[in-house]
């Protein structure tokens, strides 16, 4: 009987060690996955997706190419994972600012404008050109748009309630038409003629000004003027 207990105890110890080892392996893989994404996204932003090879990524991180492919089946899968993380981080930053710092919707718009300026400085034109030819990326962007609809409508209503957005505007039309126009701008490759900042300032910002009240315009000009 004592021998059985000893065998059971040894079995439990081995199982505990196995679980601990698996946890360490999983943690390492998770950290490596995040490192691959961070490294790849920096390169994608600067040089475009096609120019960056998977073996470049593996050499840059000093891991085997096989390991990279074990984690990400192909480059588009890697890009998609990176875009999902970027989108989640962007939403978290905006939400944190809105809850902790913003006094009204105009403050939030000013903050979003600042984030957009930062991104325009970090991301090259080639990146935008290439991602709009990738089916999985386009599907992800459409899904994000659909999920953000309700939040956007609540934001617009908050702006109306605060007196910064006009009451006579159909914001469903604004939301859908802006999506279609932005998609068409990318399709027509206007970013080759104008910078992304110019497109944002002369389309998105003009559209925002169109549904602001006089009070809203005053705060909008003040927020942007401080950047």
Predicted regions, residues:
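Short secondary-structure transition hinges
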Residues: 117-164
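Alpha-helical DNA-contacting segments of helix-turn-helix folds
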Residues: 77-86
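C-terminal peripheral helix-coil segments that are non-catalytic and often amphipathic
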Residues: 1-23, 154-158, 162, 191-227
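A secondary-structure capping/hinge motif
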Residues: 74-78, 129
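Short hydrophobic/aromatic patch on the recognition helix
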Residues: 62-72
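Hydrophobic alpha-helical connector segments
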Residues: 81, 92-122, 175-178
